[in-house]
């Protein structure tokens, strides 16, 4: 599954950067980070991607709670360290937990389109009540806490001003 949209990929290419090769934990590379939209770049920003992805799961609501709680705990650690990139990457993984779980709630196979076409397959009858729908609600709840937190909003605004 391609998480990075072509629009985000184009931004990175215009910068002449291969995000997969940059270590964003190094001070000299931190200014290269771009927030993007939604979950853009979530699988590209190393080492954060590698660390957070190990805890990202949504197969059942129980697993989603454990995953979202762990990612939120990581968010708090990054916040306490003043690491906005880590905070934003946690937000992106929470966003991706929501969107991917919704995809499976809507289409149990994970496939939205009829094979070989752009025809959208019908939604599952239980798309609002399935285990994936509940997992999506869990991730959205935690994502909203992060995205609306005073610290995140302030640090995001500061980061945007320097992009």
PLM region spans:
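Short, charge-rich, low-complexity alpha-helical interaction segments
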Residues: 13-61
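Short helix-capping and inter-helix turn/linker motifs at the boundaries of alpha-helical repeat units
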Residues: 62-66
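Short, charge-rich amphipathic alpha-helical segments embedded
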Residues: 88-113
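Intrinsically disordered, low-complexity, charge-dense segments enriched in Lys/Arg
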Residues: 111-163
């Amino acid at each position: 599954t391609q998480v990075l949209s072509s629009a985000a990929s184009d931004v990175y290419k215009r910068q002449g950067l291969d995000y997969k090769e940059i270590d964003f934990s190094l001070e000299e590379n931190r200014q290269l980070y771009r927030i993007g939209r939604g979950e853009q770049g979530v699988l590209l920003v190393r080492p954060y991607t590698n660390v957070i992805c190990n805890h990202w799961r949504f197969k059942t609501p129980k697993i989603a709670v454990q995953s979202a709680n762990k990612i939120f705990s990581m968010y708090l650690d990054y916040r306490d360290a003043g690491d906005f990139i880590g905070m934003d990457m946690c937000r992106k993984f929470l966003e991706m937990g929501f969107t991917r779980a919704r995809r499976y709630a809507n289409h149990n196979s994970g496939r939205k389109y009829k094979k070989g076409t752009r025809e959208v397959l019908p939604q599952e009858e239980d798309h609002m009540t399935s285990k994936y729908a509940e997992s999506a609600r869990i991730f959205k709840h935690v994502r909203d806490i992060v995205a609306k937190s005073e610290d995140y909003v302030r640090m995001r605004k500061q980061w945007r001003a320097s992009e």
